[in-house]
């Protein structure tokens, strides 16, 4: 009887150990898959704001952390695009703190001469049917920044039409597009200062 119990106990212990090991392997594989999918989604998003033919480095591995009031409160990531090792542009995470329903998160592709290469909203809580037209899937409004140049802090073109600028506001919703226009402008101006900052920036993960 004792031998039988001992045998069953050993069998259960081995089964438990095997199950634990299998679970660990599956979890690791799942984490790797999720991480790979996240990188692919990020790469696809980057392609929307920075033409791939402008750079030839691994953009996702050229990540830096910055604390800049121009980009909003807290730490934001900046990805530096290089062509043959020369910095040529950046993808900048930015926050518009003054959306109608809270902060709006963006990524902005820009060169170092004040030209916006692309913009996408990555997170927001704006009103459905009104402010949510900042999403690319709902409207092409966000694409109108591409190719626009900022001549300086006082560039009056960088405002919604209601404020005398060049960008459309939405019917019944001016606060949301105004917040995005201003955030993109600030990010574009910040991009001009990046080349001088590069030697002093902290790499992501450090």
Curated annotation (Swiss-Prot):
Compartment(s) where it occurs, according to its Swiss-Prot or TrEMBL record: Cell inner membrane
Major location (coarse): membrane
Cofactor (UniProt): FMN
Keyword Glycosyltransferase belongs to the record: no
Domain of life: Bacteria
Keywords in alphabetical order: Cell inner membrane, Cell membrane, Electron transport, Flavoprotein, FMN, Membrane, Phosphoprotein, Translocase, Transmembrane, Transmembrane helix, Transport
Keyword Kinase appears in the UniProt entry: no
PTM sites of type FMN phosphoryl threonine: 174
Topology term for the membrane: Single-pass membrane protein
GO biological processes: electron transport chain
Pfam families per the UniProt record, alphabetical: FMN_bind (PF04205)
GO CC, any one term: plasma membrane
GO molecular function, a single term: electron transfer activity
EC number: 7.-.-.-
Spans through the membrane: 9-29
Assembly, per entry: The complex is composed of six subunits: RsxA, RsxB, RsxC, RsxD, RsxE and RsxG.
Sequence similarity: Belongs to the RnfG family.
PANTHER family per record: ION-TRANSLOCATING OXIDOREDUCTASE COMPLEX SUBUNIT G
Function: Part of a membrane-bound complex that couples electron transfer with translocation of ions across the membrane. Required to maintain the reduced state of SoxR.
UniProt name for this protein: Ion-translocating oxidoreductase complex subunit G
Lineage: Bacteria, Pseudomonadati, Pseudomonadota, Gammaproteobacteria, Enterobacterales
Gene: rsxG
């Amino acid at each position: 009887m004792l031998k039988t119990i001992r045998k069953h106990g050993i069998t259960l212990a081995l089964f438990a150990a095997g199950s634990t090991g299998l679970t660990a392997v599956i979890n690791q594989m799942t984490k790797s898959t999720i991480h790979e999918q996240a990188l692919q989604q990020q790469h696809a998003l980057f392609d929307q704001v920075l033409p791939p033919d402008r750079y030839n480095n691994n953009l996702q591995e050229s990540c830096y952390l910055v604390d800049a009031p121009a980009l909003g409160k807290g730490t934001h990531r900046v990805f530096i695009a290089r062509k043959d090792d020369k910095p040529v542009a950046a993808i900048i995470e930015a926050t518009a703190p003054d959306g109608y329903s809270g902060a709006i998160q963006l990524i902005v592709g820009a060169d170092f001469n004040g030209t916006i290469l692309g913009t996408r909203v990555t997170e927001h809580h704006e009103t459905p049917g009104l402010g949510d037209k900042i999403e690319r899937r709902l409207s092409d409004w966000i694409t109108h920044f591409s190719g626009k140049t900022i001549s300086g802090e006082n560039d009056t073109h960088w405002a919604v039409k209601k404020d005398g600028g060049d960008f459309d506001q939405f019917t019944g919703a001016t606060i949301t597009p105004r917040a995005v226009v201003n955030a993109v402008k600030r990010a574009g101006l910040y991009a001009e200062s990046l080349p001088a900052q590069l030697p002093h920036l902290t790499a992501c993960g450090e």
